């Protein structure tokens, strides 16, 4: 592998991915995701937007203190205050980057920035010079680049390269481009930019037309050597380019691209499951690479072919991306050491003995209810327990549901708010409605339920149900998750989890105009 054919994987799940409605994560959840991304082998972890809020600063700083192999990066507007906060946040990281940006399209410069092109160049150069005071690794992004005039882009990119930028990122901020245009754009821009051969060129594509991955691959054909992407394609609006799809496209079609990454592809599925569970965004079954049906064959002809020779209908193996062939994990007789070892095999790290003991206690409870415990059960169980430990405001204790044909169901629920036990009862049009009404009779959150969904964690009637609840209040949207073999218990846990996150998000206001690329 040479530098010329090595693709840098820049993961922005913790920054751009978190901008999905309701996907906000706590500091502890971000650290868990960052650790998994490091195991996955991503080169750059964009840990957040340090200047957006004190909570964001703390999360970026905590990740910078935790990660040792990947580069830790913070996004920053081309504003001195933002850049200095980013520099301070990533300071503890052995490898650090500041990623600063400013809009360059005519419509953004005129209506959003209200700046002339010359002023934009001056601001960009100043930003890069300040960032270089903190690190030699500085990335500059031209927001809305694919709708910018290419001659102006070449001018501003040349100026920031001279000022010390080492990576130039060209975002398709609104997902407007199409692949052949993207490839042409990169080829022309790299040639036109003064000293364009001295930096790494990067693509950051959004999925508004469903072309984020295709455009990212086209950018690589056009000369880019970094792609910015997220696990499961998570991101605002239609999402971002999916890291798993880009990586596997480069691996499976190495004959066409001749490019390499440093990704451990067997960590793709564990990464997908962790991000899905923490954010409350389920992976669609037919999602490429990580969907539950990605390696399923229903056609008899296909099944026969796969049994005779897998490559007849499979262009990659399920094992190569982290799907286990034997997912049966543990049983009721399994001990604490076996449990701990299995979690490590799954890439799950618990921060303390207290957390391990709590998760093991939950495992034993589950083992009494469910004869066979699979990897997916452990992911759901640990995420549910960690959420319970970290979200201190609202905690589930117990509940009783009474239903009879022709009568309204009744929910009697016991939960705690900041350690104080509460009891509530309510009837509803169904048991779920009764649970939510009972909780709200005490919580009085004023939130609106946007989404309620239940997914079976594994196959079979004994499966755990993983429940997601999305609540909205004002301009705040949060997702809550719960898991249990009793889906009504999982439902109550998910609602209480969402209430805790709603309170958490209210306590960490974002900076005005923090922006995105």
UniProtKB/Swiss-Prot annotation:
EC number(s) from the headed UniProt entry: 2.3.3.13
Cofactors (names): Mn(2+)
CDD domains: DRE_TIM_IPMS (cd07940)
Location in or out of the cell: Cytoplasm
Catalysed conversion reaction: 3-methyl-2-oxobutanoate + acetyl-CoA + H2O = (2S)-2-isopropylmalate + CoA + H(+)
GO cellular component: a single term: cytosol
Keyword line: Amino-acid biosynthesis, Branched-chain amino acid biosynthesis, Cytoplasm, Leucine biosynthesis, Manganese, Metal-binding, Transferase
Annotated segments matching region Regulatory domain: 395-517
Gene Ontology terms describing biological process: L-leucine biosynthetic process
InterPro entries: 2-IPM_HCS-like, 2-isopropylmalate_synth_dimer, AIPM/Hcit_synth_CS, Aldolase_TIM, LeuA/HCS_post-cat, LeuA_allosteric_dom_sf, LeuA_bact_synth, PYR_CT
Gene3D superfamilies given in the database record: 1.10.238.260, 3.30.160.270, Aldolase class I (3.20.20.70)
Domain Pyruvate carboxyltransferase: 7-269
Pathway stated in the Swiss-Prot or TrEMBL entry: Amino-acid biosynthesis; L-leucine biosynthesis; L-leucine from 3-methyl-2-oxobutanoate: step 1/4
Residues that, per the record, bind Mn(2+): 16, 204, 206, 240
Function: Catalyzes the condensation of the acetyl group of acetyl-CoA with 3-methyl-2-oxobutanoate (2-ketoisovalerate) to form 3-carboxy-3-hydroxy-4-methylpentanoate (2-isopropylmalate).
Similarity comment: Belongs to the alpha-IPM synthase/homocitrate synthase family. LeuA type 1 subfamily.
Subunit comment: Homodimer.
UniProt-listed NCBIfam families: leuA_bact, PRK00915.1-3, PRK00915.1-4
The name this protein goes by in its record: 2-isopropylmalate synthase
Organismal lineage: Bacteria, Pseudomonadati, Pseudomonadota, Betaproteobacteria, Neisseriales
């Amino acid at each position: 592998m040479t530098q010329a054919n090595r693709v840098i994987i820049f993961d922005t799940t913790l920054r751009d991915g978190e901008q999905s409605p309701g996907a906000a994560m706590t500091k502890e959840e971000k650290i868990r995701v960052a650790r998994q991304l490091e195991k996955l082998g991503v080169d750059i972890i964009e840990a957040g937007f340090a200047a957006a809020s004190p909570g964001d600063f703390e999360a970026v700083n905590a990740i910078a203190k935790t990660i040792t192999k990947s580069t830790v990066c913070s996004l920053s507007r081309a504003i001195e205050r933002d850049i200095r906060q980013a520099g301070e946040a990533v300071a503890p990281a052995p490898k650090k980057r500041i990623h600063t940006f400013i809009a360059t399209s005519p419509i953004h410069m005129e209506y959003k920035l209200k700046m002339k092109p010359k002023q934009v160049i001056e601001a960009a150069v100043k930003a890069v010079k300040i960032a270089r005071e903190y690190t030699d690794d500085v990335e500059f992004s031209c927001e809305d680049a694919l709708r910018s005039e290419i001659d102006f882009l070449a001018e501003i990119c040349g100026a920031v390269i001279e000022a010390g930028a080492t990576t130039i990122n060209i975002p398709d901020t609104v997902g407007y481009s199409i692949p052949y245009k993207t490839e042409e754009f990169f080829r022309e821009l790299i040639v036109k930019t003064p000293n364009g051969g001295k930096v790494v060129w990067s693509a950051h594509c959004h999925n508004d037309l469903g072309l984020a991955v295709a455009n990212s691959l086209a950018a690589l054909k056009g000369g880019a050597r970094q792609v910015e992407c997220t696990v499961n394609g998570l991101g605002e609006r239609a999402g971002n380019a999916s890291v798993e799809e880009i990586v596997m496209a480069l691996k499976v079609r190495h004959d066409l691209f001749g490019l390499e990454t440093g990704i451990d592809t067997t960590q793709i599925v564990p990464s997908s499951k962790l991000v899905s569970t923490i954010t409350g965004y389920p992976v669609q079954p037919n999602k490429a690479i990580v969907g539950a049906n990605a390696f399923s064959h229903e056609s008899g002809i296909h099944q026969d072919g796969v049994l005779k020779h897998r490559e007849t209908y499979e262009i990659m193996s399920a094992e190569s991306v982290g799907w286990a062939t034997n997912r049966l994990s543990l049983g009721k007789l399994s001990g604490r050491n076996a449990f701990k070892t299995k979690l490590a095999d799954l890439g799950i790290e618990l921060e303390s003995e207290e957390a391990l003991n709590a998760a093991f206690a939950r495992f034993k409870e589950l083992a009494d209810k469910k004869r066979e415990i699979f990897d997916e059960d452990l992911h759901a169980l640990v995420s549910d327990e960690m959420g319970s430990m970290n979200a201190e405001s609202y905690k589930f204790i117990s509940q009783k549901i009474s239903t009879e044909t022709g009568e309204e169901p009744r929910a009697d629920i016991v939960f705690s708010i900041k350690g104080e036990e509460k009891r509530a009862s309510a009837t509803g049009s169904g048991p779920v409605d009764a649970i939510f009404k009972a909780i709200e009779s005490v919580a009085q959150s004023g939130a609106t339920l946007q989404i309620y969904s239940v997914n079976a964690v594994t196959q079979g009637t004994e499966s755990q149900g993983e429940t997601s609840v999305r609540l909205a209040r004002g301009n705040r949207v949060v997702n809550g998750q719960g898991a249990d073999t009793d889906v009504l218990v999982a439902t109550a846990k998910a609602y209480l989890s969402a209430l805790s996150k709603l309170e958490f998000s209210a306590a960490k206001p974002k900076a005005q105009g923090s922006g995105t690329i």
